[in-house]
Each structure stands twice: as C-alpha cells, then as structure tokens.
C-alpha cells in the first residue's frame, strides 16, 4: 500500500488541527482570565470553597498554546515519537478540560443552595472595610440590588444599628445621607428595591454555564487530534518499513 499520499493528507489535516488547537488554547486562556476577573467577586460570596474552574482553564489554556506549537513542529518533522507524545498530551488536555467543564457545570447548580447562607453571613459581618464587605458593595453597585431578598434584610445586621443601610444600596449615592439610611421608610425611596439573590444566582448560572460549555466543546475536539496524531505516527512508521 502506498503510504506517502496518506501521510501528506494526514500532515495537512494535523497542521490545520494544531493551528486550531493553538487558537482554542488562546480562547481557554481568555475565558479563564475573564471568569476569574468577572466572576471572582461573586464566587467569593457565593461559595465557602470557591470553584477552581477559572484557574484550571488558565493553566490548561497556557499549556495548550505551548503544545499547539509543538504539535505543528512534530507534524512538520514527521517524528513518530513526537507525534505519540503529542497524542498523549492531547489525552491529558481532554481529561483536564473535562474536569474543568464538570466543575463549572456542577458548581452552577450549587449556587442557589449556598448563596443564601454565605451572603447572609457576609451581611452580618459587614463593616464596609474588609474584602468581603467590599465584595458585597461591588455586587450591590454593579447589579443595582440591595440585601438578599430586599433592602429590609439589612435591618437585622449589626452594621445597620450604627450606620444604617450601606450606601452601595443607594440608587444615587450623592442623594443618600446617613439619616435617610437609618430609616427604613425613608430609605425605601432612596435605595434599590430588588434583592441580590435572584440577580446574582441568575448571573452566575449563566456565566458558569458558558465556562462549562466552552470547556466541554473544546475537550471533545481533542479526540480528533488524538486520532490524527496516532494515525500519522502509524503511517510514517509503516512508510519507513516500506523504504527498507
């Protein structure tokens, strides 16, 4: 059987695949960084033990960028052992992305179970200064919400007794003063009416779903690369025997 035309075809396909693979590495890296920067504040409030999915994606994406270039080099060199190493790496990437995808998908469904407790705890220990308190402020400002179900939840917090409702709840912070925020009746006209529970859980479920979907989609594409690399390695080895 003539193997050279098959080898040429497989090389072309694998080089194209390796380039696309490299692009997916850049995408994974970008999604991981985006997930950490965009969702980091929400994750710190939603879970007692935050998900590692963004970190897994960042690490995997960086590694893929490097090995995507290695895949192109191995294909051009036509080295069977390099191609086998490339296929082995693709299998490891497949497993890593599968773990990241499952982590994001499972965590997405745990959000509602943990948010009520952790966010309520954050409100009870709120002092307006520490990292967790600043995370609460960030959520309330960015989503224009207040409290868990609504602004009245703040009335049970120690902070309310001294300072009233936090200014981050205000629709317009320049129009809020401490006296208004101490009075729930007056505050009703000054602060956001929507609670953060529904808004945050919906936001997180949507965005963690994106992370999981990207990871799953790219993970299963590795199977194509593994097949191409193994086939090319086999045909190159067979061609070497034909030439002997």
From Swiss-Prot:
InterPro entries: Tetraspanin/Peripherin (IPR018499), Tetraspanin_animals (IPR000301), Tetraspanin_CS (IPR018503), Tetraspanin_EC2_sf (IPR008952), TSN6/7_LEL (IPR048232)
Pfam family, one: Tetraspanin
Organism: Pongo pygmaeus
Ranges of the Extracellular topological domain: 36-51, 108-208
The keyword Glycoprotein is annotated on this UniProt entry: yes
Name this protein carries in UniProt: Tetraspanin-7
Membrane protein topology class: Multi-pass membrane protein
Keyword Plastid: no
Keywords: Glycoprotein, Membrane, Transmembrane, Transmembrane helix
């Amino acid at each position: 059987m003539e193997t050279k035309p098959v080898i040429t075809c497989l090389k072309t396909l694998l080089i194209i695949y390796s380039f696309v693979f490299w692009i997916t590495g850049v995408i994974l890296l970008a999604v991981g960084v985006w997930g950490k920067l965009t969702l980091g504040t929400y994750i710190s409030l939603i879970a007692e033990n935050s998900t590692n999915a963004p970190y897994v994606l960042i690490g995997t994406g960086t590694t893929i960028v490097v090995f995507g270039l290695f895949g192109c080099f191995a294909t051009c060199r036509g080295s069977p052992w390099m191609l086998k190493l490339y296929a082995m790496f693709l299998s490891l990437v497949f497993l890593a992305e599968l773990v990241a995808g499952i982590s994001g998908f499972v965590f997405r469904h745990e959000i509602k179970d943990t948010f009520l407790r952790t966010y309520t705890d954050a409100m009870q220990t709120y002092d307006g200064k520490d990292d967790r308190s600043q995370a609460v402020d960030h959520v309330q400002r960015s989503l224009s919400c207040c409290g868990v179900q609504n602004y009245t939840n703040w009335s049970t917090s120690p902070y309310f007794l001294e300072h009233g409702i936090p200014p981050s709840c205000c629709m317009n912070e320049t129009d809020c003063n401490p006296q208004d925020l101490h009075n729930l009746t007056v505050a009703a006209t000054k602060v956001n009416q929507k609670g953060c529970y529904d808004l945050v859980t919906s936001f997180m479920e949507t965005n963690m779903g994106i992370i999981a979907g990207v990871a799953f989609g790219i993970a299963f594409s590795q199977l194509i690369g593994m097949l191409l690399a193994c086939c090319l390695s086999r045909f190159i080895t067979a061609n070497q025997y034909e030439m002997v």
